[in-house]
């Protein structure tokens, strides 16, 4: 899972980089592994800054001063399979045709065939293990078919038809053609989110933004916004004070199935994705979870409800209200430690849990505690939290998950774990409780979770992580290749890759 952002300003003399930086901070929760930014200045010249680390560390004042131009894109990377190196920070760039930069959120599930096609048929060199580079080169190859001196909107839309035809998976992309435009597009199933917004300036001109979540748009006064539809694309001209953005339904919508895990965990609660309030869904999750708790544990056996900060707070508070039990903030969070399941290895995840959360003993001592978290993935965080609760004096610990049991790979951009590393893999709920060291584990049912999120327009979601049935299907050998690449990256973590990838356009990459 990643955060992507693109901004085109009407004032051609203005500098977009500071606003891209601010927007990146609003999307930092979507990717803490690497950050990158590319801008377009006069005569179509591109400028870039990217590297491993948080946005505030990568985008230093010295580097930002070199990012000129009124149009640009940004990316926050969450480490998926094949993307742990500094050289794999995005945006990616190809100089031919026309000079293209691309930021990609999601994962392609037919990478084996795409890599062969790019090598054997169109003879494009792929320099990294990232599927984002594959997607960019498929688009570049399709655009090159036109063999024209200058590109136009129809050429871009036709090239995107080729991308949709060849690329399978969940993806949302923001790209930039040097000196010409921004563009954005979304996969035909709407698995990954992408929103478009506009902001009216005092002189009547308009600025435009593309972003992964609505919270970025609202924070920057892009108050008129909407979701791109599945299979839809938009082109925003660089000189957007003279030309309007153009939208086109490039391919028909296959289905409208946003990833359910966005609402459970990944998105900020103050975002609205596909017309669905993340905060509202989490309130509903708390109500449904309370009903599931009652089926497993007598409420009289619970003295207090405790949340695991931060994502589970909304759900836990509502759960406590419906159980008529006191709610307590019994874990204090260190906000300078990243999300634990994003950590690159097990040892780091275990130590990170204790650095991240500190229990207040008096909230646990001699109490029977229901702990509510958004999900249980590997069980690393859950097990340590349960241990801390018992060390602090809890007499019984029940553990409730706002999500159903996760027993399968997430293949569309949230690199949770290999299937066999998931604590619920090949285990019953009682066996999970035994593994975690608590009295009972209570999972939300999938049916209830869907009910919490659905609307009149969207009543189905991508739920493969819970069921093993993926909306796009996967090519033969993909899951095995995914696990092979993960294992390879794990082995390479001790051997640093090249610090900077090859790129002649890196004028601002110091």
From Swiss-Prot:
What cofactors does the UniProt entry give for this protein? Mg(2+)
Which Gene Ontology molecular-function terms are recorded?
amidophosphoribosyltransferase activity; metal ion binding
Instruction: Report keywords, A-Z.
Output: Glutamine amidotransferase, Glycosyltransferase, Magnesium, Metal-binding, Purine biosynthesis, Transferase
Active-site annotation? 2 (nucleophile)
User: Any binding details for the cofactor?
Assistant: Binds 1 Mg(2+) ion per subunit.
Protein residues bound to Mg(2+) = 373-374
The reaction(s) catalysed by this protein are:
5-phospho-beta-D-ribosylamine + L-glutamate + diphosphate = 5-phospho-alpha-D-ribose 1-diphosphate + L-glutamine + H2O
List its EC numbers.
2.4.2.14
What does the entry give for GO biological process?
A: 'de novo' IMP biosynthetic process; purine nucleobase biosynthetic process
Supply the InterPro entries for this chain: GATase_2_dom (IPR017932), Ntn_hydrolases_N (IPR029055), PRibTrfase_dom (IPR000836), PRTase-like (IPR029057), PurF (IPR005854), PurF_N (IPR035584)
Pathway it acts in?
Answer: Purine metabolism; IMP biosynthesis via de novo pathway; N(1)-(5-phospho-D-ribosyl)glycinamide from 5-phospho-alpha-D-ribose 1-diphosphate: step 1/2
Q: Which family does it belong to?
A: In the C-terminal section; belongs to the purine/pyrimidine phosphoribosyltransferase family.
Name used for this protein in its record: Amidophosphoribosyltransferase
Origin species, per record, is Lachancea kluyveri
Identify the gene encoding this protein: ADE4
């Amino acid at each position: 899972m990643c955060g992507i952002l693109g901004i085109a300003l009407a004032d051609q003399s203005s500098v977009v980089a500071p606003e891209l930086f601010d927007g990146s901070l609003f999307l930092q929760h979507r990717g803490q592994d690497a950050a990158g930014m590319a801008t377009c200045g006069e005569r179509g010249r591109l400028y870039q800054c990217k590297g491993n680390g948080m946005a505030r560390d990568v985008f230093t004042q010295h580097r930002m001063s070199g990012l000129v131009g009124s149009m640009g894109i940004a990316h926050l990377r969450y480490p998926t399979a094949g993307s742990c190196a500094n050289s794999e920070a995005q945006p990616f760039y190809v100089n031919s045709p026309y000079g293209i930069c691309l930021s990609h959120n999601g994962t392609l599930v037919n990478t084996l065939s795409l890599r062969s096609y790019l090598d054997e048929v169109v003879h494009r060199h792929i320099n990294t293990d990232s599927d984002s580079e594959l997607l960019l080169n498929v688009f570049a190859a399709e655009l090159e078919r036109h063999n024209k001196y200058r590109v136009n909107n129809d050429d871009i839309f036709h090239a995107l038809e080729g991308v949709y035809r060849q690329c399978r998976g969940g993806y949302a992309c923001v790209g930039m053609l040097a000196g010409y435009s921004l563009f954005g597009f979304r996969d035909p199933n709407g698995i990954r989110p992408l929103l478009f917004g506009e902001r009216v300036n005092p002189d009547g001109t308009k600025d435009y933004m593309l972003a992964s979540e609505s919270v970025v748009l609202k924070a920057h006064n892009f108050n008129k916004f909407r979701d791109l539809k599945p299979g839809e694309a938009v082109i925003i001209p660089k000189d957007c004070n003279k030309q309007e953005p153009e939208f086109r339904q490039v391919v028909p919508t296959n289905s409208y199935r946003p990833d359910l895990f966005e609402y459970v965990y990944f998105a900020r609660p103050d975002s609205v994705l596909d017309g669905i309030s993340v905060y509202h869904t989490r309130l509903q999750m708390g109500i449904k979870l309370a009903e599931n708790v009652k089926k497993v544990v007598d409420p009289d056996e619970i003295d207090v409800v405790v949340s695991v900060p931060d994502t589970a707070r909304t759900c836990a508070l509502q759960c406590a209200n419906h159980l008529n039990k006191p709610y307590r903030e019994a874990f204090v969070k260190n906000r300078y430690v990243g999300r634990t399941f994003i950590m690159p290895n097990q040892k780091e995840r275990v130590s990170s849990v204790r650095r991240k959360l500190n229990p207040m003993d008096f909230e646990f001592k001699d109490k029977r505690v229901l702990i509510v978290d958004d999900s249980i993935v590997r069980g690393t965080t859950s097990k340590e939290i349960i241990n801390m609760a018992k060390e602090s004096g809890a007499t019984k610990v029940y553990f409730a998950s706002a999500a159903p049991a996760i027993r399968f790979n997430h293949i569309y951009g949230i690199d949770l774990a290999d299937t066999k590393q998931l604590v619920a893999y090949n285990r019953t709920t009682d066996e999970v409780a035994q593994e975690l060291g608590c009295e009972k584990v209570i999972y939300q049912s999938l049916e209830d979770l869907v009910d919490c999120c659905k609307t009149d327009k969207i009543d189905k979601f991508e739920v493969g992580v819970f069921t093993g049935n993926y909306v796009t299907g996967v090519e033969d050998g993909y899951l095995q290749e995914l696990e092979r690449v993960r294992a390879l990256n794990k082995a390479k973590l001790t051997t640093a890759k090249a610090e900077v990838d090859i790129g002649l356009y890196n004028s601002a990459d110091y």
